Amino acid sequence: MAKDALLVLSGGMDSTTMLWDYAGSIAAAVTFQYGSNHNIREAECARWNCEQLGIEWIEIDLSFMGKHFKSSLLDGADAIPEGNYDDENMRSTVVPFRNGIMLAVAAGLAESRGLKAVMIANHSGDHAIYPDCRPEFVSSMGKAIADGTYEHLELRAPYTGMTKGEIACRGKELGVDYSHTYSCYKGGEHHCGKCGTCVERREALEFAGITLDND
């Protein structure tokens, strides 16, 4: 299998699972620093997993987003609401058009390196509150990337129809060490267990029968 893809890698459960799942086709992974509460912790995990697989890790600064965009995810731990992802208050964590911006940069980076595709690890649980994770967006962005690059790059999003629990099950099969992933929107040393992404993380791990000590 040719290593022809660039993965957008946050360091969370989903993109880390995709890194291990598709390591045979991933030439490099890119992590974006955009000023979120959990960026630093996520990036540490992203780099660690790339090192384990011998995949090149690239870090790109998008700090202008943290300075100019409105989102509780950019406003410090105290601004993060608690509850499930489908709760109305979790909409405050949306960073406007985050995936669109990251995919555009990733597409330019991939074409500059002579790669054929960009990969993103959105999943069905994201669709409720994140417009730029929905199948319609992925389809439209994929067309824009193909039309806007000389080599007609492909946008691959193989987890779009999967739940986070199903992704965790796949990670378990692959032997992914989820203690080297980070999800909490508050950005603390340990997962708070109360914000939407922590709740979803816990439910996914339980679904897959995975127990993490001191998470």
Give the positions of each predicted feature.
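Short amphipathic alpha-helical interaction/hinge segments
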Residues: 149, 206-209
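Short cysteine/histidine-rich metal-coordination sites, predominantly Zn2+-binding motifs
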Residues: 187-188, 209-215
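A polyampholytic, Gly/Pro-enriched intrinsically disordered region
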Residues: 81, 174-178, 202-206
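ATP-dependent adenylation/nucleotidyltransferase module used to activate substrates
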Residues: 1-175
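Local cysteine-cluster metal-coordination motifs and their immediate loop/turn environment
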Residues: 104, 180-203
